[in-house]
Amino acid sequence: MPQQSMQASLIDPIAEIERSNCKIAHLRLGLVFTSDNNERALQDSGLYSPDSEDSSVDIAGRRFHSGTLNGSSIVYVKTGSPSVNMATTLQILLVRFNIHGVIYFGNAGSLDKKTMVPGDVSVPQAVAFTGVWNWKKFGSEKGKLVFGDFNYPENGENLLGTVEYEKIKMFSPSEAPKEVFWLPITKSWYNAATEALKDMKLRKCYSDECLPGKPKVVFGSKSSTSDFYVRNKAYGDFLNDNFDAKTADTASASVALTSLSNEKLFVVFQGVSNVAGETSSNSRVSYLASYNAFLAATKFINSIPTPRLACE
């Protein structure tokens, strides 16, 4: 558990940060990610500057950092995984800080290597929880995922039966709860990202490791989120064929659901670090994927205005 910062010893640390200097009491952008690799990409870039020597605060074991990213005011936090950690940490961020919108960057696996390969960055248009299952009783009505279809060497009956993919219930302040499957990225921010990143050049090499091709930004795909990593090619193909999902991760849908429930703008940047069913990329390629996703997130952040509060 991280050591407590000076602010964390105050009665109301967040309020104190916001009151102590009116110049920082404005709406910030929330930057969230899950891993040490993601945080290292941010720190290695040299683009982040803390507001002061003591501009971090610990809440519920998470450390929140206030500063600027290439001149844009942000609060960033490493959430950890799986999805419940992302949702919990993001909710704390939105409740305790003045956040205008949420930017997530992180790693994902490609489910379609014809579309995306390691080093590419995906900016999906919609994400979904594909790990919420209704596991059917053997011999009952068939669900979408039929385990017998994957018997080897021949298809047939399987005691695991079938699985139906469930919708999730979304709550919001202004609407009655509703069941949804696909969670759309904020349209205005998605459009802004496509404009800001349309000619973006990504990094091809890190240390002595270079990608075999020129990495690219891919717009408009769909993404799958669950609490398990998709390394199996057959299941990756199933998600691609049945849901048109091109990437899979453990966090994006949590970002979407929490942001939508709080009526906050949000966008997702995924650095592709592997292809389902193929040999896992080495640590340098994985870091390069994180770094490219971070670069895309930063360029987007610097392209949008941040509203100010009255005290400015």
Curated annotation (Swiss-Prot):
Keyword Glycoprotein set for record: yes
Sites where a glycan is attached: N70
Stored InterPro entries: Nucleoside_phosphorylase_d, Nucleoside_phosphorylase_sf
Gene induction: By photoperiod. Short days stimulate accumulation, while long days inhibit.
Gene3D superfamilies hit by this protein: Nucleoside phosphorylase domain
Swiss-Prot/TrEMBL keywords: Glycoprotein, Signal, Storage protein
BP-aspect Gene Ontology terms: nucleoside metabolic process
Subunit structure comment from the entry: Monomer.
UniProt protein name: Bark storage protein A
